[in-house]
């Protein structure tokens, strides 16, 4: 049950220190190792800005557990993602008394009341109400309290407060105790700058799940719970693409498959399909199970290697070009990564950017869309390592749809259902 997970996480948050009696001493190791030890020099920073990981051995009444806590894993990136998912798309602040609509979008109860206006008097005809994000009709009677989200908002706030404590970052002793969250920085401010500077593609070896605290999967599980439930829009699919009956997977149709009629919304050169759900506000995320390796960039007519599978996943604006050659870059209203030749590329302009350290590409890719901030970020769907992030100067300005491209008749791209 998720309440049991919540209890475990709250205990972890409160476990600031280990008392001297009945506990073993903490062991502090210099951050010069390979796996699980973060160093500034390993990310291109100066050797003098080395970080030290704190490893605490906690001996309980019935069992003994190791908690290896590496500061970057508990740093600003994780808390930022939690806060993004705990932010109301209408007011931009943390959810207050969140309510859930029939379309699965959540808002503050007061924010939604202001948007919809005062309910009509008894006996008068009610004006239609719709979701501010997706536009789907949502009657007032469909509102229900989102208790789970309210709990996750509180957890996000507690994590932020915990990391804001000076001792949690500097790793100084306080009253004979050693904080178990954070690292010993030399100097601490340099390491915080390093965190901000390196929110770019990172090596998987520096963000290994083996080095996370035992309760860290609880936080990751909550992030996965908020994944949007998507389907594909067959009306936008290239005529050579085959959409599954449940509209959750797409692959290149085998030869001889009857092609559907063309239409104004359908891609005619790029082997792509859009999601049926579009977003004009708020923060949304979805996961895609990818093919084995793979270039959709050759929609311009370049030859492709028949032995390779090719795919791209990401997001596209409503204005993306459907006919002719499509510009696969932010200037063409496309924010995507491409799997090709056993490597992963960010589709940037004028040339794609090879994402070093991402070999082979992850089997699951998580797309995080923050409409107001103009940010589209990509994560490993299992470890939540950041792969790449596109950043616009402001809000994206139009409805954004999930984008799926594939040139592979063998392995489909599949939307991972929410809660899986």
Curated annotation (Swiss-Prot):
The keyword rRNA-binding does not apply. GO terms for biological process: innate immune response; negative regulation of cytoplasmic pattern recognition receptor signaling pathway; positive regulation of cGAS/STING signaling pathway; protein K63-linked ubiquitination. GO terms for cellular component: cytoplasm. Expressed in testis. A zinc finger (RING-type) spans 88-135. Pathway: Protein modification; protein ubiquitination. The keyword Zinc applies. It is found in: Cytoplasm. Residues 210-420 form the B30.2/SPRY domain. Transmembrane segments: none annotated. It holds the Pfam family zf-RING_UBOX. It comes from the Eukaryota. Disulfide bonds: none annotated. InterPro entries: B30.2/SPRY, B30.2/SPRY_sf, Butyrophylin_SPRY, ConA-like_dom_sf, PRY, SPRY_dom, TRIM/RBCC, Znf-RING_euk. Its EC number is 2.3.2.27. Keywords: Cytoplasm, Metal-binding, Transferase, Zinc, Zinc-finger. It is an enzyme of class 2 (transferase). One of its GO terms (molecular function) is zinc ion binding. It catalyses: S-ubiquitinyl-[E2 ubiquitin-conjugating enzyme]-L-cysteine + [acceptor protein]-L-lysine = [E2 ubiquitin-conjugating enzyme]-L-cysteine + N(6)-ubiquitinyl-[acceptor protein]-L-lysine. Plays an inhibitory role in anti-RNA viral innate immunity by targeting the adapter DDX3X and promoting its 'Lys-48'-linked polyubiquitination. Alternatively, enhances the cGAS-STING pathway activation by promoting 'Lys-63'-linked ubiquitination of STING1, facilitating the STING1-TBK1 complex formation and STING1 activation. (Microbial infection) Plays a positive role in human immunodeficiency virus (HIV-1) replication. This is RING finger protein 39.
């Amino acid at each position: 049950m998720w309440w049991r997970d919540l209890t475990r996480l709250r205990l972890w948050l409160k476990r600031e220190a280990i008392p001297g009696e009945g506990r073993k001493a903490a062991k502090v190791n210099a951050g010069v190792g390979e796996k699980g030890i973060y160093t500034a020099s390993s990310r291109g920073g100066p050797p003098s800005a080395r970080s030290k990981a704190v490893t605490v051995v906690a001996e309980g009444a019935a069992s003994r557990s190791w908690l290896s806590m590496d500061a970057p894993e508990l740093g600003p990136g994780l808390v930022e993602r939690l806060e993004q998912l705990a932010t109301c798309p209408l007011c931009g602040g943390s959810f207050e008394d969140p309510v859930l609509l029939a379309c699965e979008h959540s808002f503050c109860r007061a924010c939604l009341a202001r948007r919809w206006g005062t309910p009509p008097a008894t006996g008068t005809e009610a004006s239609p109400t719709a979701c501010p994000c997706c536009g789907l009709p949502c009657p007032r009677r469909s509102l229900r309290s989102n208790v789970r989200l309210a709990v996750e908002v509180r957890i996000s706030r507690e994590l932020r407060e915990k990391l804001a404590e000076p001792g949690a970052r500097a790793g100084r002793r306080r009253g004979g105790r050693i904080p178990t969250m954070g690292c010993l920085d030399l100097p601490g401010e340099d390491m915080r700058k390093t965190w901000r500077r390196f929110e770019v593609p990172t090596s998987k070896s520096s963000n290994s799940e083996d080095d996370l605290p035992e309760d860290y999967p609880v936080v990751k599980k909550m992030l996965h719970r908020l994944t949007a439930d998507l389907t594909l829009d067959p009306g936008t699919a290239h005529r050579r693409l085959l959409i599954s009956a449940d509209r959750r997977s797409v692959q290149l149709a085998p030869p001889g498959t009857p092609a559907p009629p063309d239409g104004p919304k359908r891609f005619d050169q790029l082997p792509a399909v859009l999601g049926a759900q579009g977003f004009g506000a708020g923060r949304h995320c979805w996961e895609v199970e990818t093919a084995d390796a793979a270039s959709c960039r050759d929609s311009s007519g370049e030859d492709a290697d028949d032995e390779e599978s090719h795919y791209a996943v990401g997001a596209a604006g409503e204005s993306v070009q459907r006919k002719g050659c499509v510009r696969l870059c932010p200037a063409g209203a496309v924010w995507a990564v491409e799997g090709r030749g056993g490597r992963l590329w960010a589709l940037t302009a004028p040339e794609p950017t090879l994402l070093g350290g991402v070999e082979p590409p992850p089997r699951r890719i998580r797309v995080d869309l923050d409409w107001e901030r103009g940010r589209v970020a990509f994560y490993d769907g299992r470890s939540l390592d950041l792969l790449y992030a596109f950043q616009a100067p402001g809000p994206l300005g139009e409805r954004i749809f999930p984008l799926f491209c594939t040139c592979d008749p063998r392995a489909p791209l599949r939307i991972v259902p929410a809660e899986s």
